């Protein structure tokens, strides 16, 4: 019996959600000084068949590496806009993983905005 394959090419998505870190990003000097909590969701579009068939981490993507890279980028260079942060994350993840496409959602969980539970964010998709 042959292995089950996705129809018309792989359409697999690897998810790592709600990666949290404290970053110093924002437009104002006060935002950069005080910092805020950020939450990031990552979606990597790649063929997961090798990992599904082998049950071998070397055939897939190590979620821990994804988390570490997101935290490293998020706590590294200070940027003004979460759009820039999302772009940096997309670049790093595409460079380091065999995904054909990556989508990141970045939310500034403790943004200094008026209103109840205002959580600004962006979703960015980039591909090879």
Where are these regions (language model features)?
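N-terminal, polar/charged subdomain of small-to-medium soluble alpha/beta proteins
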Residues: 1-128
């Amino acid at each position: 019996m042959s292995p089950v394959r996705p129809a018309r090419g792989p359409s697999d998505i690897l998810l790592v959600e709600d990666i949290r870190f404290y970053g110093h990003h924002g437009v104002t000097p006060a935002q950069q000084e005080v910092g805020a909590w950020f939450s990031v969701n990552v979606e990597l579009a790649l063929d997961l068949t090798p990992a599904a068939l082998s049950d071998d981490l070397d055939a897939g993507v190590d979620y821990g590496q994804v988390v570490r890279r997101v935290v490293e980028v998020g706590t590294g260079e200070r940027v003004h806009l979460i759009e820039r942060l999302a772009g940096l994350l997309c670049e790093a993840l595409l460079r380091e993983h065999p995904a054909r496409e990556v989508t990141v959602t970045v939310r500034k969980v403790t943004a200094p905005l008026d209103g109840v539970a205002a959580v600004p964010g962006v979703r960015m998709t980039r591909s090879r």
